[in-house]
Amino acid sequence: MSLLPSRAARVPGPSSSLCALLALLLLTPPGPLVSAGPVAAAVRELRCMCLTVTPGIHPKMISSLQVFAVGPQCSKVEVVPTLKNKKEVCLDPEAPLIKKFIQKTLDSGNKKN
């Protein structure tokens, strides 16, 4: 019996099954991430959308308005209108004109129902 290792002893390094798994992961296309489409657009990132705010926009330039409440992704209310030229901007939710516009929008929505 010899104390020297035999030639068939394992050489330290990644195992063949680990290499096969890594190769499989690298060759697998990220299907759900690519094919998510509109669903992925609806999911917000885990950060505030509005890093800077625009002080005000004339209400006639706004085609739609989204108001995002405080949540785990952001500690402040975010007001994001889509303008008629399809651009999205962030408005200051504390501005008096914006508060008035949001209230008017909510009131007109209640009258329609």
Swiss-Prot record:
One of its GO terms (molecular function) is CXCR chemokine receptor binding. The keyword Disulfide bond applies. Residues 1-36 form the signal peptide. It comes from the Eukaryota. Disulfide bonds join C48-C74, C50-C90. GO terms for cellular component: extracellular space. PROSITE patterns: SMALL_CYTOKINES_CXC (PS00471). It is found in: Secreted. Its main location: secreted. Keywords: Antibiotic, Antimicrobial, Chemotaxis, Cytokine, Disulfide bond, Heparin-binding, Secreted, Signal. GO terms for biological process: antimicrobial humoral immune response mediated by antimicrobial peptide; cellular response to lipopolysaccharide; defense response to bacterium; inflammatory response; neutrophil chemotaxis. CDD domains: Chemokine_CXC (cd00273). Chemotactic for neutrophil granulocytes. Signals through binding and activation of its receptors (CXCR1 and CXCR2). In addition to its chemotactic and angiogenic properties, it has strong antibacterial activity against Gram-positive and Gram-negative bacteria (90-fold-higher when compared to CXCL5 and CXCL7). Belongs to the intercrine alpha (chemokine CxC) family. This is C-X-C motif chemokine 6. The gene is CXCL6.
